[in-house]
Amino acid sequence: MGTPLLRFSARPVRRRLLGTLGPALLAGALLAGGQAGAAYAAAGTDATPTASAPSVQLPEAQPSSAQLPPDGDTVASPPGANDWSCKPTAAHPDPVVLVHGTFANRYENWLALSPLLKSKGYCVFALDYGTVPGVTSSGSGLLLPIGGLGPADRSAAQLGRFVDLVRAATGAAKVDLVGHSQGGMLPNYYLKFLGGAAEVDKVVGLAPSNHGTTLDGITKLAPYFPGAADLIYTACNACRDQAVGSAFNQKMASVPDTVPGVRYTVISTVYDEVVTPYRTQFLSGPNVDNVVLQDSCPVSLAEHVAIAFSPTALHLVANALDPAHATPAFCG
């Protein structure tokens, strides 16, 4: 059964992303990122982007977790990720698993971080989760799911299965998890309720929805992701799960923010307009570093989406993964 389409016009987005991405990275996003890359470019100008939602046929049933794709699938991986022959080194014994956000996919979300970590010698892996059959983005000519839609608890279970695949392929005892937005929050559910604490060494969240947000905040993602406005109130169970006061968030709040033995880093931006107030992203616990991007780069205008492409934020991620070799993170 088809779902009535919602038309939307994005509000003007301030000139933030160009100063954050840099010309080379922005060009790469445009060439490789398809629709989301084009949205990032539009957000970096004073133009008011408008979009007409594509015709999307949604299934009658509520979305459920997608099956993990087999090796050699046609779903695009970001540069540097999903080399299943990669073996961790003594310098970086924990593979890094990248977890994208709501309305996103592994390819577009991690165009910047994945190749950076690969160049530093990490084994890097990235999954797509929470997808709905038939809901895809094809602006780049690749099969790009619109992910992060399914029930958050099922997506966390899907993350757990992917971690098991990575550990089996690499021989690693544990992994490090790096997530953006919803992808920064899901590891917490996996650790708290699905036995992930024994399999994870570090968790790094970029603008994570750790304690929920408002549906109004989630709608502010729509200008960046063509078709998202159609999905917020139809196929996006994760949107409702991330709302403050949801049953999912009540369960998350019923236990402490963190589990023993895992090191957490939260990287937030004062300009976050999606997960608000931004300090609600912070975690409480003795094993937590809560970091504000502008403390390292006061002039950074990176907001909720751009933080995943901010050179300063990515430097902070690298420091969190390898604190013994951390270096000062400045602008640029």
For each feature predicted by the language model, list its residue ranges.
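Serine-dependent carboxylesterase/thioesterase catalytic core
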Residues: 100, 124, 147, 152-252
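Secretory targeting and sorting signals
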Residues: 1-42
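Active-site catalytic motif of lipid deacylating hydrolases and related acyltransferases
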Residues: 58-74, 82-174, 221
